[in-house]
Amino acid sequence: MIYDNNQIISLAKKFRKAIDKAYNNGDFDGDICFKHFPRGCCGDTCYLLATYLYEKGVESLYVCGNFGMQSHAWLVLKDKRVSEPAPKFRIPSDEENRLIEMFGGKKYDKPVDITKYEESNIENGIIVDLTADQFGEVPVFVGYIDGFHKEFEFDFAHEMDYVLEGRLVELYNIVYNYL
């Protein structure tokens, strides 16, 4: 399904509202991170929101940036505004293979895919950020890159791994109960 920006805003606000309800009801008091929501929760929130959006048919990328000693993470919708990175492969060096084998891995004798997203691939994408209020910004931001997100030096972006197990599943289920 293809969503317009207003529908994405609606989904993002609904999900943030569910997080806020769970937080205010004390459902996160036992969680090492979410008991301080939104402070320090941007990465985990990205995984939770990406899972919710994926269930609605919306794919996203996880983006991380740094500003001084601070880091921040947000999603970029994976749609026609985002360009796919050019495929890159390389053969690990003998030293890398030695280290891999030393830690119980198997030596690579074929090229390894090292394709990754660069800032230029995502610069025209739509950002979805539910935790910028930890920096005094709006609690739900959906839009093109703004002054706040430009402050963060691009570190990396990758395809989302969706919540499948562990602590994040528990958090997702808590939030989902408030949707």
Feature roles, as predicted:
Residues 1-179:
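A structural boundary/capping signal
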